[in-house]
UniProtKB/Swiss-Prot annotation:
The protein's name in its UniProt record: UDP-N-acetylmuramate--L-alanine ligase
Main location: cytoplasm
Function: Cell wall formation.
EC code(s) of this entry: 6.3.2.8
GO terms assigned for molecular function: ATP binding; UDP-N-acetylmuramate-L-alanine ligase activity
Source organism per UniProt: Lawsonia intracellularis (strain PHE/MN1-00)
Alphabetized InterPro entries for the sequence: Mur-like_cat_sf (IPR036565), Mur_ligase_C (IPR004101), Mur_ligase_C_dom_sf (IPR036615), Mur_ligase_cen (IPR013221), Mur_ligase_N (IPR000713), MurCDEF_pg_biosynth (IPR050061), UDP-N-AcMur_Ala_ligase_MurC (IPR005758)
Catalytic reaction annotation: UDP-N-acetyl-alpha-D-muramate + L-alanine + ATP = UDP-N-acetyl-alpha-D-muramoyl-L-alanine + ADP + phosphate + H(+)
């Protein structure tokens, strides 16, 4: 980055993607300021690292700043953004700053509608095992780091690429991963065709010597591959892929053989449950093999993987009740979480506390949400987490509850907020239940509160 850049201001600094970049910048010696709407453990961590952070977005927060970095959730009417533009201070999206960091390393960008965070974390773990010491920027807390970012001394930067606002097209990696392509983020994209076009552009953006590692089993990926003019390696469960898995065991622990380019590399043991995590592991193997990491290091790294925060995360037990927390907020992610829960806890009642995320997503996928949520044993449904979106008439959790009741007979109860859900837990849970707090908003807070009350 240009030596004239001294002080960086980050609007929405507490977000999962922004905070990781902030941590890397702090470790590189930059002066980092920022703001967010509320205190959090992430804010506290960044302050300890030296960041100066204000709570609330106010124009007077800006001082002598070289550049302003904005989260994708921050709109143009934000007073800090407006003042920066009035004073001619550059305002750039998060992905553009990530691109600047990527210029310092060889970039690996991991994209897809689902599975980005876990796949990025698995890839980082394999690179660590091989002694590559990568710089890593993730959208969740990698348990091995205790953080969502780390500045390494090696030549690679492994980053989660956010497709939600199209800004992932700014990145300049030499290796891309696409885990899947599904309908989402219709607050930005006007159609599924636009989403497909964005991913095609993303894959074609790698240099001529670069590589795309993509899930060959995914229908969305299959549709766009004929339009990709760069090199591609596919992975999946089908033997037609370049890299594929032969499942031995799929449950609390995943065991599978990996066949790459016709050669069996060996047996992988992965402690992350769920069939979807086998696919995530295959993506990590594909990237690792591409940069010359041995199959032995791949197998060892995956076996030592300690997981990611909020991805089917075990929180604890109380009175015979198991508490799991998961970030899933798209119907396909919810389905994967519930499928995993049924395999891990086959004879137990599954109670889900779900907080939908964004009005636009709930509207676009209303029917899909009704279908997948109707498969649980007991559903506690709270109001939609807006993520700075404005309400859409008729799109609310009460109507979602009614939609579920119209197609199933499951026990579903609506609660106006997460406090009401928390206070209801002692009355609806009993010994032997599995409580899953599910969603990308604030629902994550009620599990620990329940365990300690």
């Amino acid at each position: 980055m240009n030596s004239k850049i001294k002080s960086i201001y980050m609007v929405g600094i507490g977000g999962s993607g922004m905070s990781g970049i902030a941590e890397i910048l702090l470790n590189l010696g930059y002066e980092v300021h920022g703001s967010d709407i509320m205190e959090s453990h992430i804010i506290h961590r960044l302050r300890k690292l030296g960041a100066i952070i204000s709570i609330g977005h106010q124009a007077e927060n800006l001082g002598d700043i070289s550049v302003v970095v904005k989260s994708s959730a921050v709109t143009e009417d934000n007073p800090e953004i407006q003042l920066a533009r009035q004073h001619g201070i550059p305002v750039i999206p998060r992905a553009e700053m990530l691109t600047e960091l990527m210029r310092l390393r060889k970039g690996v960008a991991i994209a897809g509608t689902h599975g980005k965070t876990t796949t990025t974390s698995l890839t980082a773990t394999v690179f660590d095992t091989a002694g590559f010491d990568p710089t890593v920027v993730i959208g969740g807390v990698l348990n091995a780091y205790g953080a969502n970012a780390r500045l390494g001394q090696g030549q690679y930067l492994i980053a989660e690429a956010d497709e939600s606002d199209g800004s992932f097209l700014l990145l300049l990696p030499i290796i891309n991963v696409v885990t899947n392509i599904d309908l989402d983020h219709l607050d930005y994209y006007r159609s599924f065709e636009e989403i497909e076009h964005a991913f095609v552009t993303f894959m074609n953006n790698v240099p001529f010597y670069g590589m795309n590692v993509v899930c060959g089993d995914d229908p969305g990926v299959q549709r766009v591959l004929p339009r990709v003019n760069r090199q591609v390696i596919t992975y999946g469960f089908e033997s037609s892929n370049h890299i594929w898995a032969e499942i031995i065991e799929c449950g609390i622990i995943n065991r599978f053989k990996v066949i790459a380019h016709g050669e069996c590399l060996g047996e992988v043991i992965l402690t992350q449950p769920g069939k979807h995590n086998i696919l995530n592991a295959l993506a990590a193997i594909g990237v690792a093999l591409e940069v010359g990491i041995s199959p032995k290091c791949c197998i060892e790294g995956l076996a030592n993987f300690k997981g990611v925060g909020r991805r089917f995360e075990y929180k604890g037990e109380k009175n015979g009740i198991t508490v799991i927390d998961d970030y899933g907020h798209h119907p396909i992610e919810v389905a994967a979480t519930l499928e995993t829960a049924r395999k891990v806890f086959p004879d137990r009642r599954i109670v889900v506390a779900f907080q939908p995320h964004r009005f636009s997503r709930t509207q676009a996928l209303f029917g899909e949400f009704c279908q997948v949520l109707s498969t649980v044993d007991k559903l506690l449904l709270t109001e939609i987490y807006p993520a700075l979106e404005k309400p859409i008439p008729g799109i609310n959790s009460q109507n979602l509850a009614q939609g579920i009741q119209q197609i199933s007979k499951i026990d579903v109860t609506y609660y106006p907020d997460i406090d009401a859900v928390f206070h209801a837990l002692p009355h609806v849970l009993c010994a032997g239940d599995v409580l899953i707090t599910l969603g990308a908003g604030t629902i994550t807070t009620i599990g620990p509160k329940f365990l300690t009350c």
